[in-house]
């Protein structure tokens, strides 16, 4: 994946969205992610460090090496780690298909919201497994935009989401990859493959989720796909704006929103 392939873009708004998303989802996605003292953990595709901060705080005695293909994103990640006073993270500019680490040199591998942007996720996983020691753990977290359902129902809102899916597919990605994690990891011959769905539900009685997920994570993500969706001719501006307006209705007092993430773990034989 190159910077041009990231459908959400590398804007300041996207960096803010990623940070908001990570904070909102921290407990849901990471309550069972901890690494032992002294272990070396590779975070592949760390981006702006939104997940890095959570990992480093939750496993302060582990050593993280976080890699990304974007120097711009790595600079933001370093700033975020320094602001929080964390000292157990090292950043490297690297392509996860050609990692600068010896074979079997790392104890654990973690990646979150990365495979969805890659045209050949199996190939990327094989490259990651090369540097993972036998018996070491692999953790993969992905969403699945096909799992989004909401009230009030709206074909226009669903069309806007589908435009994001199509734009991501045009860039070589798969926004529905969450449902594929189990067969994907199984096909690589890994041991102890397990997938845990992580369900989000937001309504007026759960204002933190309405604001943090419905508005600042999901709707903001779809809004960020306007440029590629319009450029590719997937939709016109009037229909796009109507879809976004209907999506925003789901965050009002009578609205509801549901979504499922998938967290997969496995071990290298």
Show where each model-derived region lies.
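A short glycine-rich, Lys/Arg-flanked "PGG" loop and its adjoining helix->strand segment in the class I
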Residues: 122-137
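Conserved alpha-helix/loop element of class I SAM-dependent methyltransferases that forms part
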Residues: 20-39, 54
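A short SAM/SAH-binding and catalytic strip from SAM-dependent methyltransferases
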Residues: 107-121
């Amino acid at each position: 994946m190159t910077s041009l392939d990231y459908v959400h873009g590398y804007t300041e708004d996207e960096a803010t969205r990623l940070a908001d998303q990570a904070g909102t989802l921290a407990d849901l996605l990471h309550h069972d992610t901890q690494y032992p003292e002294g272990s070396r953990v590779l975070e592949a595709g760390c981006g702006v460090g939104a997940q890095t901060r959570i990992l480093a705080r939750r496993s302060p005695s582990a050593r993280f090496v976080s890699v990304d293909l974007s120097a711009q994103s790595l600079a933001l990640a370093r700033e975020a780690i320094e602001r929080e006073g964390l000292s157990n993270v090292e950043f490297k500019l690297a392509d996860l298909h050609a990692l600068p680490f010896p074979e079997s040199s790392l104890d654990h591998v973690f990646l979150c919201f990365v495979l969805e942007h890659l045209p050949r996720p199996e190939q990327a996983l094989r490259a990651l497994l090369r540097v993972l020691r036998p018996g070491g753990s692999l953790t993969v977290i992905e969403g699945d935009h096909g799992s989004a359902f909401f009230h009030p129902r709206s074909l226009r809102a669903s069309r806007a989401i589908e435009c994001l899916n199509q734009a991501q597919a045009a860039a070589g990605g798969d926004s529905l990859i969450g449902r594929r994690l189990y067969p994907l990891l199984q096909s690589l011959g890994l041991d102890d493959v397990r997938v845990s769905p992580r369900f989000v539900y937001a309504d007026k009685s759960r204002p933190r989720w309405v604001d943090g997920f419905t508005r600042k994570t999901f709707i903001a993500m779809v809004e960020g796909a306007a440029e590629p969706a319009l450029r590719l001719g997937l939709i016109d501006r009037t229909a796009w704006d109507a879809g976004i307006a209907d999506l925003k209705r789901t965050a009002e007092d009578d609205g509801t929103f549901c979504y499922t993430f998938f967290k997969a773990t496995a071990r290298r034989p």
